[in-house]
């Protein structure tokens, strides 16, 4: 899964593909490099990012509208119209250039998910685990699309203050189980769900390493697994020198090592910014398995 950030402030590329034409070019390049799918996102969820979380009352008022209101969001969050303006032209252009391309939309907003799938996306990748927008589960059930449920603890602006967990894998496994069962009960087909343990999402540096090493414990939930370690902070911390984390743009080899562990533990999908390198790594890891 190749990453395409149509944002001005993502931690990994800092707006390199905020221009829509460049984003389309990059998506097509990743597909040409061998990506099975591209994940297109229009809002950063980097640490300290502000995001919109709707109450169920607000959703009840908005769910029948064509495009949900933006009055409840943080001033720093990306509005639905703005997010749609970023991603829809890219999705449409990729679909025109490569009609058979598999496209994922990276969003936690049900309104964006619906419009993106109507424009040609086949998968919704929700970093909130379908938790931030109460309309998301109903929307995904209606759309009958693929759904990536990501484990996240709290919101990005809360991560620094989260209480530590003695055994975070047990928490992640229990919550993923609860969230998937709720999603299935509310209408999402089991065979459309992929689970992501959410490396870096509400976990501190020390917690990410055992989560990845123990990834195989999630197989008991009986869903395909996605791993997204690409360029993340815990990679930079592992490669730190003289007290300074490795810069984002120089984390490739650490990323590949993390992805190799993920593959060895049974990951089905690798979400990456560096498709060619990750694909070579995956092929070699498969040969040695």
Question: What kind of region is each of these model predictions?
Answer:
Residues 1-2, 29-42:
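N-terminal glycine-rich anion-binding loops that anchor highly charged ligand groups
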Residues 5-9:
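Short polar catalytic/cofactor-binding loops
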Residues 10-29, 45-52, 66, 73-96, ...:
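Active-site-adjacent loop and "lid" segments of alpha/beta metabolic enzymes
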Residues 56-58:
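Charged/polar low-complexity intrinsically disordered segments
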Residues 60, 65-68:
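Short, low-complexity intrinsically disordered segments enriched in A/P/G/S/L with frequent Arg
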Residues 189-192:
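Short acidic capping loops at alpha-helix termini that bridge into adjacent secondary structure
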Residues 199:
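Acidic helix/loop microenvironments that form the catalytic cleft of cell-wall polysaccharide enzymes
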